[in-house]
């Protein structure tokens, strides 16, 4: 399977660089996985696509203002993008600088906080913050929202609210679980009133989510690792939902990766730790019956995940139609509602 199999042409003007006026103001492309049929809707129409007893699973991670600026004690300027909170005083981070800092060197942040570079772990740097503060406090005070590269603008005050789900409670992500950005409190209440169950998992989205697949043969791709948690309570809800003949609906590919990681032994079980699950065509889904997701970058692992869910041909056709109908793409863009194609795992890509 080649990386280029997942390529498509996207006009630059279809990349959404700002959110819609309201969270639910996006369009919704419905893809029936088994048949490939498409229907053009508005996001609030999701209420009519779910049924009483269905279980919607959301990722409750919260984006931290992970981008900060500073300089080395020697004077050279640099940019830090936190990747993972290790503990109250330590983070793993990407450091952009003309010359990489060495272990033991001091970085002075824009508010005067002095941070020590402790060690290098391949492309990431371990940074230690002073004992009289916490890494999260410093980031919350002076950090910028880590907007994706393709948004191609500086973050603004509005992004602190809109590049964040309304239900995110667990701080630690450096990228938003973007399917969740479309939900507001009113829609969540309407779903609940309809009898749709809601459950929450946690996956702290890392900057690696934007890393391109660089190898031609996708089987040679090394997937990035992210921290996740699926509780016993969520597992019990999933089992009860399945037993009642209802659907498990994942909100976002991060929720998919959580649930499918937790079910690697065939049955969903509590899980806390790292996941580097790579889902591509041929994968047999074990938990997820339907998916709410945004449109993903060409040749990305997330487009491969969707292709494995709905079928390669159905997915690529849906993307062609979305381009033709001028849907808005990527993090601040429009969404899809997709039902699972159980035959997708048998599909050959030629």
From Swiss-Prot:
Keyword Transferase: yes
Catalysed reaction equations from the record: 7-aminomethyl-7-carbaguanosine(34) in tRNA + S-adenosyl-L-methionine = epoxyqueuosine(34) in tRNA + adenine + L-methionine + 2 H(+)
Keywords: Cytoplasm, Queuosine biosynthesis, S-adenosyl-L-methionine, Transferase
Molecular function GO labels: S-adenosylmethionine:tRNA ribosyltransferase-isomerase activity
InterPro entries per record: QueA, QueA_dom1, QueA_dom2, QueA_sf
Highest taxon in the source lineage: Bacteria
Location within or outside the cell: Cytoplasm
A GO CC term assigned to this protein in UniProt: cytoplasm
UniProt-listed GO biological process terms: queuosine biosynthetic process; tRNA wobble guanine modification
EC number from the UniProt entry: 2.4.99.17
One Pfam family matching this protein: Queuosine_synth
Coiled coil: none
Function per UniProt: Transfers and isomerizes the ribose moiety from AdoMet to the 7-aminomethyl group of 7-deazaguanine (preQ1-tRNA) to give epoxyqueuosine (oQ-tRNA).
Alphabetical list of PANTHER family matching this protein: S-ADENOSYLMETHIONINE:TRNA RIBOSYLTRANSFERASE-ISOMERASE (PTHR30307:SF0)
UniProt record similarity statement: Belongs to the QueA family.
Record protein name field: S-adenosylmethionine:tRNA ribosyltransferase-isomerase
């Amino acid at each position: 399977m080649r990386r280029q199999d997942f390529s498509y042409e996207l006009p630059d003007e279809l990349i959404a660089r700002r959110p819609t006026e309201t969270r639910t103001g996006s369009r919704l492309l419905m893809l029936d996985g088994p048949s490939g049929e498409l229907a053009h809707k508005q996001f609030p129409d999701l209420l009519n696509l779910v049924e009483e007893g269905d279980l919607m699973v959301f990722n409750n991670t919260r984006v931290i203002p992970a981008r900060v600026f500073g300089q080395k004690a020697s004077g050279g300027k640099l940019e830090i993008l936190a990747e993972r909170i290790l503990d109250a005083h330590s983070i793993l981070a990407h450091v952009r600088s003309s010359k990489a800092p060495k272990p033991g060197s001091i970085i002075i942040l824009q508010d005067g906080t002095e941070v020590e570079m402790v060690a290098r772990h391949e492309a990431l740097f371990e940074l230690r913050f002073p004992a009289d503060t916490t890494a999260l406090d410093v980031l919350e005070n002076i950090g910028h929202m880590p907007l994706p590269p393709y948004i191609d603008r500086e973050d603004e005050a509005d992004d602190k609210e809109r590049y964040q789900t309304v239900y995110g409670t667990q701080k630690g992500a450096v990228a938003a679980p973007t399917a969740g950005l479309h939900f507001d409190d009113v829609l969540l209440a309407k779903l609940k009133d309809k009898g749709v169950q809601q459950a929450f998992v946690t996956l702290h989205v890392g900057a690696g989510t934007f890393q391109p697949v660089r190898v031609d043969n996708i089987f040679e791709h090394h997937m990035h690792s992210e921290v996740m948690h699926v509780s016993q309570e969520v597992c019990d809800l999933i089992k009860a939902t399945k037993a009642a003949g209802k659907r498990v609906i994942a909100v976002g590919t991060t929720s998919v990766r959580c649930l499918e990681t937790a079910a690697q032994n065939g049955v969903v079980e509590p899980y806390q730790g790292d996941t580097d699950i790579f889902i591509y065509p041929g994968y047999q889904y074990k938990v997820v019956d339907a998916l709410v997701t945004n449109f993903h970058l060409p040749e990305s692992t997330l487009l491969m995940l969707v292709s494995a869910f709905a079928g390669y041909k159905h997915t690529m056709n849906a993307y062609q139609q979305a381009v033709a109908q001028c849907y808005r793409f990527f993090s601040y863009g429009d969404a899809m509602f997709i039902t699972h194609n159980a035959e997708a795992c048998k599909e050959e890509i030629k």
